[in-house]
Amino acid sequence: MEKITIFDKTFKTYIPYDEFIGDIDRVAEELNRDYSGGDDIPIILCTLNGAVMFCAELMKRITFKCEFATIKVSSYSGTQTTGVVQVKQPMLCDVTGRRVIIVEDIVDTGYTMKLMKSYLSEKGAVDSRICTLFYKPESYRFKDVINVDYIAREIQNQFIVGFGLDYNEIGRNLKDIYILDE
């Protein structure tokens, strides 16, 4: 088991790339099934910076026509979610009357997704769905209110880095997923 150090924290391998890439294949198949054949062109909205690697892998597998856009939101400080969500870089496309697929690296408490769904509704989107690489069901606070539509993999309520996820902006480039080694 490989161990790495980022600043003051040591991490160990949690999920190797080869184990979760099949989860991305499955989610892409679900999206292709649900969005192929429609007259409209949905928007794939990648949340920066964490979802970039997941979104890139997903986009390679999507077979329906789609538009690509980005948005930057943040709710983390170090290893903890702050509970305060901020839009740091708004999307540059018009979502009025459009369907939007929010691509997220990890859904934890759900506060970011609650803000995103509300934000997209205010901007005129007719539908928004959540597609996440990782989902922490133990910490999710909006189970009866906001559905997480496409989940690549459920994980335990532990802090992870790699494949886009970071610890103070470091570790996004790691191919595998690492967990705190405590």
List where the protein language model places each region:
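PRPP-associated nucleotide enzymes
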Residues: 1-182
